[in-house]
């Protein structure tokens, strides 16, 4: 397994491409923005995207979901408690794309020849989850405290 981190969007949210190096299949975690950046990486490395997994439904983690799902034909996974989450000041709502799937605490999702264990980690959002794949833990914003907003530096 190999992991490529792509900082995307104004908040430079980490989008992860988790790669099965034996099959060149991958899973995209939290495609928050810049679908072109994500797709360029997938295509330039001859990867076959098998799924999109979301740690929660905030705009900076789901902004490119529909574009990446449309271009790859991949199912999108999210915890049901975040499916209709308000994601922006404009009131824009995240809607699970057709063919989307729900996961919850304790589920094990086999995708791209890898297994992703789902751990419910509510708090940042009601449906927040963390994902374990082999020796990697993907937490989204679970460990983030918002007593202040930390923005990326230039």
Spans of features found by a protein language model:
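Short Gly/Pro-enriched turn/cap motifs at secondary-structure boundaries
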Residues: 6-8, 99-101, 119-122
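Active-site HxH/HxHxD metal-binding segment of metal-dependent hydrolases
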Residues: 26, 33-111
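Short active-site segment of divalent metal-dependent hydrolases/proteases
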Residues: 59-63, 127, 144
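Conserved catalytic scaffold of divalent metal-dependent phosphoesterases
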Residues: 81-83, 107, 114, 124-125, ...
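Ser/Thr-glycine-rich phosphate-binding loops at phosphate-binding pockets of nucleotides
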Residues: 53-56, 121, 125, 139, ...
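Core dinuclear metal-dependent hydrolase active-site scaffold
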Residues: 3, 17, 107-132
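Conserved beta-strand hairpin/beta-sheet module of binuclear metal-dependent hydrolase folds
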Residues: 1-45, 130-140
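Conserved small/polar residues in nucleotide/adenosyl-binding loops
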Residues: 147-153
